[in-house]
């Protein structure tokens, strides 16, 4: 999934190639100093027909320490939503680290997550470290830091293609 120039003198060049060649002119000196040749944003369109996993992403400091990478702060823009579609973002009540672990282990973490019924045009800011998930019937534009680090904490006991429960973190 690469962004590629569609026409003109640079036709066929990927965004990565453009950044390597024209980094400072394209992104500015400060962005290149901080991110090097990595484009700092990733944009996804997510058409969720089922509830997606409950997850959380590390901040820059933790991601650097554990993965030598960037963390992930996100923003969701609701493009479309079925009637009654919901997102989860953050906790609905204060919980202790012990209660958090217990709820993850006994599959009740969703009971303490804040749910929001969504409508086209809604926007959600998800700072790194906030537990979140996209619900069934949601079509979301997700704008985020470029990072692949996701800690899946609950996945509704789904199985992968081999019949095994997907890995939780």
Summary of predicted features, one role per range:
Residues 1-95, 156-169:
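Transition-metal
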Residues 18, 22, 103, 112:
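Residues that form generic nucleotide/phosphate-binding pockets
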Residues 54-57, 117-136, 145:
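Conserved metal-binding segment of the jelly-roll/cupin
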Residues 62-63, 84-89, 95-100, 127, ...:
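Short, well-ordered, mixed-charge alpha-helical segments that flank or form enzyme active sites
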Residues 65, 110-115:
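Short helix-to-loop capping/linker segments positioned immediately adjacent to catalytic or ligand/cofactor-binding
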Residues 70, 110, 122, 126:
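Short, glycine/acidic-rich beta->alpha junctions
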Residues 73, 135-138:
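Short edge beta-strand segments in beta-sheet-rich domains
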Residues 88-111, 141-169:
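Double-stranded beta-helix
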């Amino acid at each position: 999934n690469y962004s590629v120039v569609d026409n003109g003198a640079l036709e066929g060049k990927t965004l990565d190639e453009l950044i390597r060649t024209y980094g400072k002119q394209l992104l500015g000196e400060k962005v290149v100093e901080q991110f090097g040749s990595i484009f700092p944003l990733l944009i996804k369109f997510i058409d969720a027909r089922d509830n997606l996993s409950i997850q959380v992403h590390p901040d820059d400091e933790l991601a650097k320490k554990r993965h030598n990478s960037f963390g992930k702060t996100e923003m969701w823009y609701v493009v479309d939503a079925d009637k009654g579609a919901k997102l989860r973002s953050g906790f609905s009540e204060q919980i202790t680290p012990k209660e958090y672990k217990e709820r993850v282990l006994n599959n009740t973490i969703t009971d303490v997550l804040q749910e929001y019924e969504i409508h086209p045009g809604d926007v959600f800011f998800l700072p790194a470290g906030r537990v979140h998930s996209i619900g069934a019937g949601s079509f979301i534009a997700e704008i985020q830091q470029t990072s692949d680090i996701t800690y899946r904490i609950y996945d509704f006991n789904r199985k992968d293609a081999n019949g095994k429960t997907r890995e939780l973190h």
